[in-house]
Each structure stands twice: as structure tokens, then as C-alpha cells.
From Swiss-Prot:
Source species: Bartonella bacilliformis (strain ATCC 35685 / KC583 / Herrer 020/F12,63)
Similarity comment: family membership: Belongs to the IF-1 family.
Any Gene Ontology CC annotation: cytosol
Keyword presence, tRNA processing: no
Domain S1-like residues, every copy: 1-72
Gene, per the UniProt record: infA
Main location: cytoplasm
Subunit details: Component of the 30S ribosomal translation pre-initiation complex which assembles on the 30S ribosome in the order IF-2 and IF-3, IF-1 and N-formylmethionyl-tRNA(fMet); mRNA recruitment can occur at any time during PIC assembly.
Stated name of the protein: Translation initiation factor IF-1
Function: One of the essential components for the initiation of protein synthesis. Stabilizes the binding of IF-2 and IF-3 on the 30S subunit to which N-formylmethionyl-tRNA(fMet) subsequently binds. Helps modulate mRNA selection, yielding the 30S pre-initiation complex (PIC). Upon addition of the 50S ribosomal subunit IF-1, IF-2 and IF-3 are released leaving the mature 70S translation initiation complex.
UniProt-listed SUPFAM superfamilies: Nucleic acid-binding proteins
UniProt-recorded Gene Ontology molecular function terms: ribosome binding; rRNA binding; translation initiation factor activity
Presence of keyword RNA-binding: yes
Highest rank taxon of the organism: Bacteria
């Protein structure tokens, strides 16, 4: 998938789910399920409930996403 096809949204983690998944509420009030990107896992960046994050989504499935950045 090329980089141009990726949609980016900001949101807040509202719930931690099993298997390193998170329930995220986006700025446009949609709720999605997201997992951490490999680079965040590699650098051991922790994501907790209440954290403000950036999520990448594909236009083909708007219910799942990948957490790419945690705001400080």
C-alpha cells in the first residue's frame, strides 16, 4: 500500500484490549480498534488509556487502524 492512500486521524485511547489492541475515539467521534505500529513496539513506547495518539487507517476498512505516534 502506498503512503498516499493512508488516512491519518488524531484520537484518544479509551480502553485497553487484550492482545495489544486499543479502543480509540477519534476526533470525529468514531470509535475504532487499533494496534501499535512495529516501530513503536520496537522502541517500547507505552500507550495507556487517556493518551492522545495519531492513527493511520486504510480507506478500505475504516474500523481498524494502526497507532503511529503518541503525543507528549
Amino acid at each position: 500500500m502506498s503512503k498516499e492512500e493512508v488516512l491519518e486521524f488524531s484520537g484518544v485511547v479509551i480502553e485497553l484490549l487484550p492482545n495489544a489492541m486499543f479502543r480509540v475515539k477519534l476526533e470525529n467521534d468514531h470509535e475504532i480498534i487499533a494496534h501499535t505500529a512495529g516501530r513503536m513496539r520496537k522502541n517500547r513506547i507505552r500507550v495507556l488509556a487517556g493518551d492522545k495518539i495519531m492513527v493511520e487507517m486504510t480507506p478500505y476498512d475504516l474500523t481498524k487502524g494502526r497507532i503511529t505516534y503518541r503525543y507528549k
